């Protein structure tokens, strides 16, 4: 039996579920995903439009299936739907033992609704239900963005008994809206007679992009005081989000009533944890965000960095919200418009996923056209 890497095992022991932010057919076929489960404490997988765009554009792992779908007359949307849901279903099966061993907390695989629907509530709900039926695995999570149109969709999808990964959360205010949508959805699910213990949700809070945006603005200000604040906002923001999570899930009467009926907490998930600035430690968004009942989804490069030299000293979040708030107070005092930062990041987040989806559509369409000749 392969042994787990000690740094990642320490992270797991501290209450952080390690998920891989990547999926490809090669990773599934080669046994690499299973290897990461066995040696690097990986207990979940997240995907997004950019990940699938990369997987389908590299190598030839999908060629035979695309050719077969072309022969059957599948259009580009149906082709992408089939190849991505097949990968996700297979990943669900690989992770099923972890799902069973954790009582349904981990062993989860996420698939995102079409990013072009980010501002359309009803179509998001419809597609979430379709994806849930197509993949047909209890350890699936449907990713829905935390846009204003996404919030009612999240509640409606949870009310159907479907597990949800809420993505593209950048601000604590929006995170509060997401937790409210979770409670609303679970209350409706209870009224509809669903087993609440079977419905799972995580709230994916993006970290590194916050630093990238705020650091750029601090550099434009250029004062010594501004430059001294670089690299602090992302972690501070996530720590404030965890404090908000604790308020709701450790004391709120609405949640306590649901808990008595079997509902679990909506765990914070740290996403966008690959460090983009080479001046910062490449494990910054892992070792500084350790707390019970959290998930950290990492690109493989970050996973390897933590395995190699990540220093995990236990809980690094609880009790830090005062210091985190001070960072935000200083940012605002120096002229950083935080609400504008979060609006920009949400718009860019949706646009990036839409652009990746368009690239995926265009590349797959070109492949289908070539096969039709």
UniProtKB/Swiss-Prot annotation:
Q: Does the keyword Cytoplasm apply?
A: yes
Cleavable signal peptide: none
Active-site residues from the entry: 143
Matches recorded under InterPro entries: Aldolase_TIM, TAL/FSA, Transaldolase_2, Transaldolase_AS
Which cellular component terms (GO) are annotated to the entry? Answer: cytoplasm
Question: What are the GO BP annotations of this UniProt entry?
Answer: carbohydrate metabolic process; pentose-phosphate shunt
Keywords of the record: Cytoplasm, Pentose shunt, Schiff base, Transferase
| UniProt-listed Enzyme Commission number(s) | 2.2.1.2
Cysteines engaged in disulfide bonds, as pairs: none
**Pathway note:** Carbohydrate degradation; pentose phosphate pathway; D-glyceraldehyde 3-phosphate and beta-D-fructose 6-phosphate from D-ribose 5-phosphate and D-xylulose 5-phosphate (non-oxidative stage): step 2/3
What one GO molecular function would you report for this record?
transaldolase activity
**Which enzyme type, at the first EC level?**
transferase
Q: Where in the cell is it found?
A: Cytoplasm
For this protein, the record's HAMAP family field holds: Transaldolase_2
Q: Family, per the entry?
A: Belongs to the transaldolase family. Type 2 subfamily.
Q: What does this protein do?
A: Transaldolase is important for the balance of metabolites in the pentose-phosphate pathway.
For this entry, the protein name equals Transaldolase
Record the organism.
Mycobacterium marinum (strain ATCC BAA-535 / M)
